[in-house]
C-alpha cells in the first residue's frame, strides 16, 4: 500500500482507533497465528505514518493485535518484505457500505499483488480469525504459482536474446575478414627472418645442406677469428642474432676448425719442404 491510501484512511475515518488496520509484518508472520506488532522490529513497517494515531483497540481483537508503536521509522520498501497482507482480519465493527466499497476500491487500485492475492485479502476482511491457517495455505500456493510463472516467462524470454546474440556474432565474424584485408601490414625484405625452417631432411631423406648468406658467414668468421671454441651461452646468442639454430652454429664451427687445422698442416709441410730445399 502507498501513503495515499493511509492518508485517505485518516481523512475518511477520523476515529482511527475504532477501526482495525492490516498487520504488515515480515514473511515469518504467515504462520497461522499473528504476532504482536509492538514486539516486531520497526523496520518491518515500510512506511512513515507521519504521526497518525494507529493505536488498535485491544478489546475487540482478543489480544491478537497490539498497539502499533508511534515511533516507527520510515524505511524504503525492501524486496525482502512482501507488500501484500499476510494475514486475515477479524470481523471489525460495522462500517457504512459507502466507506467499505471506497476502501476496497483503493486497495484494488494501489495493491501491487496479483488478482488472486486481492481476492484472498477481500475475502479475509469478511471471515473470522479462525480461518487464518486456510489463508496461509492459499498464500503459499499463490507464491509457488508466481515463481513458476516467473520461471516460464524468463525461460521464454531468454530464447530471444540468445537468437539476437548469435545473429550479432555471425555479423561480427563476417565483418572481420574484410577488416583484416584492409589492415594487412606491409612486410619489407629486411623484416623477414632467414632460415626459419630448421628441418634437416631433404627431398631424398638426407640432411639438407645449409646455405649461409654472406652476412652470416662474415659474422661467423669474425667470431672464429677471436675464439675458435664457443661456450653454450655465446652459441645461443649468435644463433639468435643470425636467425640460426644452435646445431647449425656448432656444425659450422666444427667444420671451420677442421679447415683451419688442414690449412695449418699444409703451411707447416710447405715450410718444412722449403727449409730442407734451402739447406740442400
Curated annotation (Swiss-Prot):
InterPro entries referenced in this protein's UniProt entry, alphabetically: Antp_homeobox, HD, HD_metazoa, Homeobox_antennapedia, Homeobox_Antennapedia_CS, Homeobox_CS, Homeodomain-like_sf
Name used for this protein in its record: Homeobox protein Hox-B5b
Statement: the UniProt record of this protein carries the keyword Secreted: no
SUPFAM superfamilies: Homeodomain-like
Subcellular location: Nucleus
DNA-binding region positions on the chain: 205-264
Residue ranges, compositional bias (Polar residues): 117-133, 162-185
UniProt GO molecular function: DNA-binding transcription factor activity, RNA polymerase II-specific; RNA polymerase II cis-regulatory region sequence-specific DNA binding
GO cellular component terms attached to this protein's record: nucleus
SS bond list: none
Classification via PANTHER family: HOMEOBOX PROTEIN HOX (PTHR45659), HOMEOBOX PROTEIN HOX-B5 (PTHR45659:SF2)
Region (Disordered): 79-185
UniProt keywords, alphabetically: Developmental protein, DNA-binding, Homeobox, Nucleus, Transcription, Transcription regulation
CDD domains registered for this protein in UniProt: homeodomain (cd00086)
Gene3D superfamilies found in the cross-reference section: Homeodomain-like (1.10.10.60)
Task performed by this protein: Sequence-specific transcription factor which is part of a developmental regulatory system that provides cells with specific positional identities on the anterior-posterior axis.
Residue stretches spanning the membrane: none
Pfam families given in the database record: Homeodomain
Family: Belongs to the Antp homeobox family.
The organism of origin for this protein: Takifugu rubripes (Japanese pufferfish)
Motif (Antp-type hexapeptide): 187-192
GO BP of this protein: anterior/posterior pattern specification
Amino acid at each position: 500500500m502507498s501513503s495515499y491510501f493511509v492518508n485517505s484512511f485518516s481523512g475518511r475515518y477520523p476515529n482511527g482507533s475504532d477501526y482495525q488496520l492490516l498487520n504488515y509484518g515480515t514473511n515469518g508472520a504467515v504462520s497461522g497465528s499473528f504476532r504482536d506488532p509492538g514486539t516486531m522490529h520497526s523496520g518491518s513497517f515500510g512506511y512513515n505514518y507521519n504521526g497518525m494515531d494507529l493505536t488498535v483497540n485491544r478489546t475487540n481483537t482478543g489480544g491478537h493485535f497490539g498497539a502499533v508503536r508511534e515511533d516507527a521509522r520510515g524505511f524504503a520498501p525492501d524486496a525482502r518484505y512482501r507488500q501484500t497482507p499476510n494475514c486475515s482480519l477479524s470481523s471489525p465493527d460495522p462500517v457504512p457500505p459507502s466507506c467499505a466499497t471506497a476502501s476496497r476500491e483503493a486497495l484494488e487500485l494501489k495493491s501491487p499483488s496479483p488478482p488472486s492475492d486481492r481476492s484472498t485479502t477481500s475475502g479475509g476482511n469478511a471471515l473470522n480469525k479462525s480461518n487464518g491457517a486456510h489463508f496461509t495455505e492459499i498464500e503459499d500456493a499463490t507464491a509457488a504459482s508466481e515463481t513458476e510463472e516467473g520461471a516460464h516467462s524468463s525461460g521464454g524470454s531468454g530464447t530471444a536474446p540468445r537468437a539476437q546474440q548469435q545473429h550479432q556474432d555471425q555479423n561480427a565474424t563476417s565483418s572481420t575478414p574484410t577488416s583484416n584485408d584492409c589492415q594487412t601490414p606491409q612486410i619489407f625484405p629486411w623484416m623477414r627472418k632467414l632460415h626459419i625452417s630448421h628441418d634437416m631432411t631433404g627431398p631424398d631423406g638426407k640432411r639438407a645442406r645449409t646455405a649461409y648468406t654472406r652476412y652470416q658467414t662474415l659474422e661467423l668468421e669474425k667470431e672464429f677469428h677471436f675464439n675458435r671454441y664457443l661456450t653454450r651461452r655465446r652459441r645461443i646468442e649468435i644463433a639468435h642474432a643470425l636467425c640460426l639454430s644452435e646445431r647449425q652454429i656448432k656444425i659450422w664451427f666444427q667444420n671451420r676448425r677442421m679447415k683451419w687445422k688442414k690449412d695449418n698442416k699444409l703451411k707447416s709441410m710447405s715450410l718444412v719442404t722449403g727449409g730442407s730445399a734451402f739447406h740442400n
